Amino acid sequence: MFGYVIADLARLDEGQQTRYKSFYCGLCRALYRGYGPVPALALTYDMAFLTLFLSALYEPDEKSGAARCLRHPAQAQSWTQTAFTGYAAAMNCLLAYENRRDDWHDDQKLSAAAAAGLLGPGAKRAAAQYPEKAAAIRAALQTITQAEEDRTAYSEAPANAFGELMAELFAVKADRWTPVLRQFGRSLGKLIYFMDAACDLEEDRRANQYNPLALLDMQSGADFRPQLMLLAGDAAEAFERLPIVQDAALLQNILYSGVWTRFDAAFRTKQEEPT
């Protein structure tokens, strides 16, 4: 369900693209140094967005540099880190591990079991640093698994559980913005869950795999776009309530345009102009 919260690079200027990539590289650097090379390979742009988002809201000090890495051994890459980079790295590590565990549970693929084994030590360190977050992630994913075992009726329970998972990630600390951050994460999580379900609907039907939209009267996942737009609107409403100035245009690009990239590619629909 990850890989949806990405930028629409074609709509970013060169400076914004450089800024976006530097946060991604900063997160990769934190993953490698904190948890090892295998977790670094499981890096997602979703968690780079988390770093960028929290940094834009709280505006902590930044540090930056340039370095070569496993992905780019020939040329040094610019990176940016803040106080939230380590947190996002830990969440990335936990989510990657739990995702592979769930893949093993669902499909019994040896590759998933092997990946979970390699990610396990890093996830254990991340869980020791953030035990409450680790417990919340595991509980949410267990709720999703249990809800998905009932294929007899349409249910929003899995989407709600994923929404709560994302709410937990964005509520990085208790302060005046926590309720809005939880609302934002909850709405974004539900959007991601249902968007992923819409993109996978045809394939899941062929494979007789669980999909919450399979029991609805629709020919294609593209038919669910109006409902997705409502969820995207909920996330946008929460976002606009936050006093974000730094990197606001970049974040708006991701939320209002980039998040639709995979959906539009899946159904070859024309990208709507953001309002």
Task: Label each residue range with its predicted role.
Residues 253-257:
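A glycine-rich phosphate-binding loop feature that marks nucleotide/adenosyl-phosphate handling sites
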Residues 1-183, 190, 194-229, 237-247, ...:
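Acidic catalytic motifs of isoprenoid enzymes
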Residues 248-252:
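Short, flexible loop/turn segments with low-complexity composition
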